[in-house]
């Protein structure tokens, strides 16, 4: 029983020790997520203890990419993490960029089309589509694009348009922390000579 415990400790120590750096080596031993490594441990126990560096190189080199250290393993880092962290936020950002800024800017356009003449609508279509955050007073005289509001007609009756209109014409606010003049710099003062210490003061210090 003691020999099996000693053998298990040796196997664990072989994987726990950091390996010397060499080209193509990531510098970190991680095989807990790989099924092939656990099978190879059972098959090649003796070879693993005798030559851990060579066995590790032959087993680890294919899953790791050439650019270095990956703490969670190659397959876990490249497949699972992008699905969770990148695709869902992209769908939210696409919805926020396309629906929220564009639709409030389209409501005043629909109201103005009945009042203003139509000739300049098609010329300003690209600039209004790509820059939806322009102030509304600049958009009103140009009469942009009658075509785009049709796909978003269910989205048009939104209440956030009314609070946005009074906020845009406000003048820029003064800075929250105004710069104050710095105090005058003190001129360099000459150092006074130290008074000569007599023997009584030296004795007190000692």
From Swiss-Prot:
It is found in: Secreted, Extracellular space, Extracellular matrix. Residues 128-142 have a biased composition (Low complexity). Keywords: Biomineralization, Extracellular matrix, Repeat, Secreted, Signal. Residues 1-16 form the signal peptide. InterPro entries: Amelogenin (IPR004116). The keyword Lipoprotein does not apply. Residues 143-180 have a biased composition (Pro residues). Residues 118-180 are annotated as: Disordered. Pfam families: Amelogenin (PF02948). The keyword Cell wall biogenesis/degradation does not apply. GO terms for biological process: enamel mineralization. One of its GO terms (molecular function) is structural constituent of tooth enamel. Its main location: secreted. It comes from the Eukaryota. GO terms for cellular component: collagen-containing extracellular matrix; extracellular region. SMART domains: Amelogenin. Belongs to the amelogenin family. Plays a role in biomineralization. Seems to regulate the formation of crystallites during the secretory stage of tooth enamel development. Thought to play a major role in the structural organization and mineralization of developing enamel. This is Amelogenin, Y isoform. It comes from Homo sapiens (Human). The gene is AMELY.
């Amino acid at each position: 029983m003691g020999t099996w415990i000693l053998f298990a400790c040796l196997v664990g120590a072989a994987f726990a020790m950091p390996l010397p750096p060499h080209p193509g080596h990531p510098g970190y031993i991680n095989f807990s997520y790989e099924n092939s490594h656990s099978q190879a441990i059972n098959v090649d126990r003796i070879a693993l203890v005798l030559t851990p560096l060579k066995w590790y190189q032959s087993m680890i080199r294919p899953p790791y990419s050439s650019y270095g250290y990956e703490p969670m393993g190659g397959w876990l880092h490249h497949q699972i993490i992008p699905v969770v962290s990148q695709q869902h936020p992209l769908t939210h950002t696409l919805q926020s960029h396309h629906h929220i800024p564009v639709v409030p800017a389209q409501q005043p356009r629909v109201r103005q089309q009945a009042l203003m003449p139509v000739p300049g609508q098609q010329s300003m279509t690209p600039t209004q589509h790509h820059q939806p955050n322009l102030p509304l007073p600049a958009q009103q005289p140009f009469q942009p694009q009658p075509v785009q509001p049709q796909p978003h007609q269910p989205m048009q009756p939104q209440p956030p348009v009314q609070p946005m209109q009074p906020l845009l014409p406000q003048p820029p606010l003064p800075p929250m922390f105004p710069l104050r003049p710095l105090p005058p710099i003190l001129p360099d003062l000459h150092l006074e000579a130290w008074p000569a210490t007599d023997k009584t003061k030296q004795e007190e210090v000692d």
